[in-house]
Each structure stands twice: as C-alpha cells, then as structure tokens.
Regions:
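Short, aromatic/basic amphipathic alpha-helical patches
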Residues: 62-74, 234
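Amphipathic alpha-helical repeat scaffolds
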Residues: 36, 127-134, 252-258
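Active-site/ligand-binding-proximal alpha/beta "capping" segment
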Residues: 195-250
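Structured adenosyl-cofactor binding patch, chiefly the S-adenosyl-L-methionine
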Residues: 97-99, 138-142, 153-169, 232-267
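RNA substrate-binding interface of SAM-dependent RNA methyltransferases
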Residues: 4, 72, 78, 102-202
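Glycine/small-residue-rich loop that forms an oxyanion/phosphate-binding "nest" at active or ligand-binding sites
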Residues: 69-97
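Boundary-proximal intrinsically disordered activation/regulatory segments immediately upstream
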Residues: 1-67, 153-154
Length: 267
C-alpha cells in the first residue's frame, strides 16, 4: 500500500472528502464517513465495510503504520498537512484521520435472524445519534448478536453515531424495519423472548423476569426513545414487560444506561 502525499488542497482527487459533512449527499452516493484514528483503525481491522479512501495527516499516517500496511492496494490513502484538513472536510473533529467506505446493502430482520442472532437490542423511535451510537457501543460490549431499528430510529452509519459508538456501528449487525409491529412478531416467531423495558413502577423488575426465563431461549430487549418511551403497539407485542428498578426520586434512566443494566441482568 502506497501513501499519496497531496501537494495542493485543491487537488481534484480529494473531491469525495469535500462533502463528508453533507449527510444527504453521502446517502445519495451510498457512502459513509468514519472519523478519528481509533475508529478508522477499527474500520480497517474489524469491519466488513468496503473502504473507498482515507485522508490522513502525516502524524496520523505514522501512528497507523501497522494497520495501514494491511490496507489493500485498491484503497487510496491521501496524506495532507494538518492545517488543510478542516478546509477540505468542513469540520475539525477528525483528529487527523477520515475514511470513506461504501454503505452496505440493507439487511432485513429475517436476514439478521437467519444468521443465528439470539441476543438482540430492539429500538423504537430512538432518533438521537448520540443514543443510537451509545446503544451500539453498549450492545457490542455486552455481546449482542444484532440490533433491530424500528420506525423513527436514527441511522447507525450516520457520522456522529459511528463516532459515539467508538466504531461498534461498523461491526455489530443491524437491520432497519419500518413494518412495525410486524417485525416484533418475526422476532418472537424465531423463539426469541421479547422483553419490553418501561419505567412503569407497576411492572416486575428485570431481575425477576430474568430469573424466570428459560436459559436456552434467546432474548430481545425492546427500548423506546427517552421521553415518550415505547408505543402501546410495541408494548402489546412483547412477551413480557419489565422495569429497571431505580430510586423512587428518579423517574427514568438514559436509554443507553437502561440498556446496559438490562443486558447485564440478561447476560
């Protein structure tokens, strides 16, 4: 793999990097943007996404030498001076490393489950990219096999979501399915217990629900957006509803924290 040192910020070979802040244009071209050295390294080392090109500072290229040595020759690796980066990309959160990759084909819930997924996070209405990214990171930390995103959910491959996920969005399988609550029925049809999480104090605690479930059965934890929570349709589609027990002085948890607690209990 050869590094291409760019001598002019106007070099036409950098054209693709000039719209990395334009989500609509990225979607139109079927591309995703990965920023930050550690996340770019995860893309190169662990992800199945097809990498198109890299834009690095000289310092980042030196730091990533071992990983870059394994990059296929078909991937263009451009090196530019640090002061040029913001002018080329339009933002300054990249820490000297940006990658552009091809967006993978969409995966259905059926395809996700056909791959053997038995431990899932299922999201409804979670649109905030910080929460989407945080949930992907949490899911990877607790070994989920996949994430199902229903109506109103944000894109796990949105630039900020990838960054917040620390690259987990690049390796954890996920499926978007707007056909709701049909998708929830598909999950249950595969023998996976669907557990809906709600702050309703009248519900049994996740500890009690986890203690009663069959260890051999898969589990899908269903979470809604902060504030509105799950819709009645989603709650009605679940096998069981449960709450994360918290102090009576508090009304709820951040959705990422709730997911982490529940995944630990249902480990």
């Amino acid at each position: 793999m050869a590094l291409t040192h760019i001598e002019s910020a106007a070099d036409p070979r950098l054209e693709t990097f000039r719209f990395v802040g334009d989500a609509a244009e990225l979607e139109r071209r079927g591309l995703v943007v990965v920023e930050g050295r550690l996340v770019v390294e995860r893309l190169l080392a662990d992800s199945t996404l097809q990498v198109h090109a890299l834009l690095l500072t000289a310092a980042a290229a030196r730091a990533m030498g071992v990983v870059l040595a394994r990059v296929p020759a078909s991937v263009e690796v451009f090196v530019v001076p640090q002061p040029w980066m913001q002018g080329i990309t339009g933002f300054n959160l990249h820490r000297g490393s940006i990658a552009i990759a091809r967006r993978p084909p969409a995966v259905s819930v059926e395809e996700l489950l056909a791959g053997g997924a038995r431990r899932l996070l299922v999201l409804e209405g979670v649109g905030n990219p910080d929460n989407v990214g945080g949930l992907l990171r949490t899911g990877r930390a607790f070994g989920v096999d996949g994430v199902v995103l229903g109506p109103g959910c944000g894109d796990p491959l949105y630039r900020k979501a990838i960054r917040v996920s620390c690259g987990a969005a690049l390796v954890v399988p996920f499926a978007h399915d707007p056909d709701w609550p049909r998708a929830l029925g598909v999950i249950r049809h595969h023998g996976i217990e669907l557990v809906a999480l709600s702050p309703n104090p009248s519900l049994p605690s996740i500890d009690d629900v986890a203690a009663r479930r069959a260890p051999s059965r898969g589990v899908a934890l269903l979470l809604g957006a902060e504030g509105p929570g799950l819709t009645d349709a989603a709650l009605d589609a679940a096998d069981v509803k449960a709450r994360v027990p918290i102090d009576a002085a508090s009304d709820s948890l951040n959705v990422t924290v709730a997911a982490a607690v529940a995944l630990h209990v249902f480990r």
